[in-house]
Amino acid sequence: MAESDAAAPAKAKPAALRKGALVKVNRAAYSSSLEAGASDPTAPDYIFEGPGELLVVKGDYGQVRWNRPVPDVWLRMDQLEACS
């Protein structure tokens, strides 16, 4: 008798963000990150509200441009989510 390997259903991965996507920063992921520790103690609200445009994706990082007169920033892709 063959035992069935009933694995728990895998959690569906969110769609991968690509160049040109509108994104915002996930507050929970960012607040406990190395990037947050190296930045201002209080992050600006606009990064959590979005939208920012994903300009470049290199490995685990993405460059985001906000619709404001501020420099572009590099953030880990796991800290970004699609802006709805």
UniProtKB/Swiss-Prot annotation:
Cite a single GO MF annotation: oxidoreductase activity, acting on NAD(P)H, quinone or similar compound as acceptor
What is this entry's stated membrane topology? Peripheral membrane protein
Q: Which UniProt keywords apply?
A: Membrane, NAD, NADP, Plastoquinone, Quinone, Thylakoid, Translocase, Transport
Subcellular location field: Cellular thylakoid membrane
**UniProt key word NADP:** yes
Do you know which InterPro entries this protein is assigned to? NdhO
Which reaction does this chain catalyze? a plastoquinone + NADH + (n+1) H(+)(in) = a plastoquinol + NAD(+) + n H(+)(out); a plastoquinone + NADPH + (n+1) H(+)(in) = a plastoquinol + NADP(+) + n H(+)(out)
Query: What is the E.C. number?
Result: 7.1.1.-
Q: Which GO terms describe its cellular component?
A: plasma membrane-derived thylakoid membrane
| Superkingdom classification of source | Bacteria
Q: What class of enzyme is it?
A: translocase
Which function does this protein serve?
A: NDH-1 shuttles electrons from an unknown electron donor, via FMN and iron-sulfur (Fe-S) centers, to quinones in the respiratory and/or the photosynthetic chain. The immediate electron acceptor for the enzyme in this species is believed to be plastoquinone. Couples the redox reaction to proton translocation, and thus conserves the redox energy in a proton gradient. Cyanobacterial NDH-1 also plays a role in inorganic carbon-concentration.
Query: Tell me, how does this one assemble?
Result: NDH-1 can be composed of about 15 different subunits; different subcomplexes with different compositions have been identified which probably have different functions.
Q: Which family does it belong to?
A: Belongs to the complex I NdhO subunit family.
Name under which the protein is recorded: NAD(P)H-quinone oxidoreductase subunit O
